[in-house]
Amino acid sequence: MPNWGGGKKCGVCQKTVYFAEEVQCEGNSFHKSCFLCMVCKKNLDSTTVAVHGEEIYCKSCYGKKYGPKGYGYGQGAGTLSMDKGESLGIKHEEAPGHRPTTNPNASKFAQKIGGSERCPRCSQAVYAAEKVIGAGKSWHKSCFRCAKCGKGLESTTLADKDGEIYCKGCYAKNFGPKGFGFGQGAGALVHSE
């Protein structure tokens, strides 16, 4: 059939689209009334349209049909849909059933993740409100002291050896270099035999 009016053809109904009712998208023309999602039939505009070949979709239906698969995809932030997409021709695969863990140290893992960690000094549970981390372990604030002199420590002012924590002074005296001038402070010269 000849195109006497010279207008463009609608990408949906293939009828002539006149200027007053034309919506353009990716080089194609549509009637305003035909510019609808091919699945849910919602009205579209330049901010809500998603194009796949010659087909137009709202972003939600496009995401369900062509985006990542799984619960929560294609809806937008903060939503979870149980729609598996059968209406879009998506085949659903059943997930394998739950199998119990084969980890022999499952109780240690559960203790770290599900329960509370234990303080290395007193072996009691350490909860978030009283936790201080030092030497890679969680301590009670009251237990976070030098093992020799009992001085309170900061995570930046400690030294650790064999699972215990020390202030820098006690660590230097007990585990540092031995000999003239070591471990006594500035200006001291001590002979040790």
Curated annotation (Swiss-Prot):
Domain of life, per lineage: Eukaryota
Motif Nuclear localization signal in this chain: 64-69
SMART domains: LIM
Subcellular location: Nucleus
Keyword Phosphoprotein (UniProt): yes
Protein keywords: Acetylation, Isopeptide bond, LIM domain, Metal-binding, Nucleus, Phosphoprotein, Repeat, Ubl conjugation, Zinc
UniProt subunit comment: Interacts with ASCC1; ASCC2 and TRIP4.
Listed name of the protein: Cysteine and glycine-rich protein 1
Species of the source: Rattus norvegicus
